[in-house]
């Protein structure tokens, strides 16, 4: 599968979130895929991932108040592959996108090794269609582990991780970065 290497076009705020956008989305496969996730909405209301907060009840609540895309909390790829209790905590129990209160979920992983990241992604059930590489976490633990925002300092490694996931998994791959500008 191909990766989504684009950002949403800017849209002006409006009282009606389903009002047609003034900006035409390019007719590319990634844009068509993203539009399909939004169920026809011209706007993406995304609940960004939050450590230990973006769990299932929070995602359900977020969707109740208009979010149409949600992330899981950051999942550590090495721990997901080696620690059974950790994996049980973060392993999806059902297809959230098909639940009446659910919707699309981006399963966010952090790590600094392409094979470990691939092994973690391959443990997910097949209905988990999208994985996200965390390149935004600025916390000290991410710095010590060489992942999150600090992975951006290792461009060659990041390219290896993205390339490995895109070519060797059957999931969509996105990368979350932090823009502190």
Predicted regions and their residues:
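Glycine-rich, positively charged N-terminal anion/phosphate-binding segment
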Residues: 19-41, 50-126
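A structural motif
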Residues: 67, 128-130, 170
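Non-cysteine beta-strand/loop elements that form the S-adenosyl-L-methionine
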Residues: 72, 130-138
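Active-site-proximal loop/turn and secondary-structure-junction residues that shape catalytic pockets
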Residues: 76, 111-113, 137-139, 179-181
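Conserved non-cysteine loop/helix-boundary elements of the Radical SAM core domain that shape
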Residues: 77, 145-156, 181
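A short acidic, helix-capping loop that chelates divalent metal ions and anchors anionic groups
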Residues: 79-81, 140-145
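Alpha-helix-loop-beta-strand connector modules within alpha/beta enzyme cores
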Residues: 91-104, 151-175
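Active-site glycine- and acidic-residue-rich loops that bind
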Residues: 113-116, 156, 172-181
């Amino acid at each position: 599968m191909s990766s989504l290497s684009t950002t949403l076009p800017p849209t002006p705020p409006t009282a009606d979130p389903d009002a047609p956008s003034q900006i035409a989305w390019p007719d590319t496969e990634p844009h068509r895929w993203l539009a399909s996730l939004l169920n026809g909405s011209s706007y993406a209301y995304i609940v960004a991932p939050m450590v230990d907060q973006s769990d299932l009840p929070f995602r359900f609540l977020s969707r109740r108040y208009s979010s149409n895309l949600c992330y899981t909390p950051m999942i550590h790829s090495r721990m997901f592959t080696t620690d059974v209790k950790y994996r049980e905590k973060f392993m999806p129990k059902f297809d959230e996108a098909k639940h009446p209160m659910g919707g699309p979920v981006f399963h966010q992983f952090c790590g600094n090794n392409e094979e470990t990241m691939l092994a973690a992604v391959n443990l997910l059930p097949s209905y988990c269609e999208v994985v996200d590489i965390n390149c935004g976490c600025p916390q000290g633990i991410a710095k010590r582990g060489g992942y999150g925002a600090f992975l951006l300092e290792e461009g060659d490694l990041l390219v290896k991780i993205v390339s490995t996931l895109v070519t060797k998994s059957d999931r969509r791959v996105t990368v979350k970065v932090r823009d502190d500008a």
